[in-house]
Structure formats: structure tokens, C-alpha cells
Design a protein with these regions (language model features):
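Generic detector of well-ordered alpha-helical packing
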Residues: 1, 37, 44-46, 117, ...
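Short Gly/Pro-enriched turn/cap motifs at secondary-structure boundaries
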Residues: 1-2, 36-38, 104-109
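Short connector loops/turns at beta-strand edges and beta->alpha or beta->beta junctions
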Residues: 1-4, 77, 137-139
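Conserved anion/nucleotide-ligand pocket segment
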Residues: 1-21
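Short small-residue beta-strand/loop micro-motif enriched in glycine and branched aliphatics
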Residues: 5-7, 81-84, 142-146
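Gly/Ser/Thr-rich beta-alpha loop segments that engage phosphate groups in nucleotides
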Residues: 7, 11, 43, 141
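Phosphate-binding site of ATP-dependent enzymes
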Residues: 14-98, 126-130
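ATP-dependent carboxylate activation and anion-phosphoryl transfer catalytic cores
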Residues: 90-169
Length: 169
């Protein structure tokens, strides 16, 4: 589905015979469907917020699941391990943080957002950062990525949200 969230209606298609059933499932969720190539690699998510006074790029979270991809079951039925901070090389962590900040600025984002990436390998075996999606209204439950990242940064979510509201402009 081109809209919605939580990977509702999303399938991983490995051969042509799986395409039609996957499309049927997707169209049950939305009247618009998007097909994209699969990127093999490590999925990470990084939160960021900016106020009139500062930029805070939160520690990235690494997503580890035994499922085919980070699907609904992995997200909501405990079939995932979330590691914050993500196990990235210092160079890759810096590249992701700079990319996250640049995307925030390009979008003229406000408040707190989260950007998901796949870290794949290039032909020389070096990390390649691939932006997957931008979440402008990220989840804020106690187990969501942003609160985890805020805690990993040694911050309190109430203080962060107050800071954003009080110092946005």
C-alpha cells in the first residue's frame, strides 16, 4: 500500500508467481500500491529534533528480526530485537547522522521525526546508506523507537517534548 503504516499489506515477493497474490493483499489495504526493490542489509532508524536553539540527532536503533523483513508481526508481536545505539562503524554512524540532519533541513521539518535506512554493502564491501522512509509522525509509545533513542541519549521524553514545544521558533 502507498499509504498507511505498520507494514499492513506489505509482502516480500521472491518470484513472479508471488506478485499477483501480494498485489491482492496490498489492494485490500489501499487503492494505491507501490512496488519497490528489496534492499538487503541492516535496517536502522534515527530520530532527530531541532529547536530554535539546537539540533539533537538521537542514537540510531538497529532492527534485527528473523522474519523476511520488519513486518507487522515483527513490529507488534515481539518478533524483533531493537538495539540502541545501533552497531554501526563510527564513519557510518556519522554519515547517517549527517544525512538525517540534512533531510530534516531539506524538508523544513518541525518537531521530532524519524528516518529509516537500510545499510547495505557496496561492491567493495563498504557500508552504503540507503534512505528507506521518513516518518514525520513517529510512534511515541514507551516501546517505540523515539522514546528508546531519547533514553539511550540520557534524556527524558517529557523534557524533550517540552523543549520542542517551548523552543520551536
Amino acid at each position: 500500500p502507498a499509504a498507511d503504516g505498520s507494514s499492513f499489506g506489505v509482502s516480500k515477493v521472491k518470484n513472479a508467481d508471488q506478485l499477483a497474490p501480494a498485489l491482492r493483499v496490498a489492494f485490500m489495504e489501499s487503492n494505491e500500491v507501490m512496488i519497490e526493490g528489496f534492499l538487503d542489509g541492516t535496517e536502522i532508524s534515527q530520530g532527530i529534533y531541532k529547536t530554535a536553539e539546537k539540533t539533537v540527532v538521537l542514537p540510531a536503533t538497529e532492527v534485527v528480526t528473523a522474519n523476511e523483513f520488519f513486518d507487522y508481526d515483527a513490529k507488534y508481536n515481539g518478533q524483533v530485537q531493537e538495539i540502541t545505539p545501533a552497531r554501526l562503524s563510527p564513519e557510518t554512524a556519522e554519515e547517517v547522522a549527517k544525512t538525517t540532519s540534512r533531510i530534516y533541513d531539506i524538508l523544513h521539518a518541525n518537531g521530532i521525526i524519524r528516518i529509516d535506512y537500510i545499510i547495505s554493502k557496496d561492491k567493495d564491501g563498504k557500508d552504503k546508506v540507503n534512505m528507506l522512509e521518513i516518518n514525520t509522525t513517529p510512534g511515541m509509545t514507551v516501546t517505540s523507537f523515539i522514546p528508546q533513542q531519547v533514553r539511550a541519549a540520557g534524556l527524558d521524553i517529557k523534557d524533550v517534548l517540552s523543549e520542542i514545544v517551548e523552543n520551536q521558533f
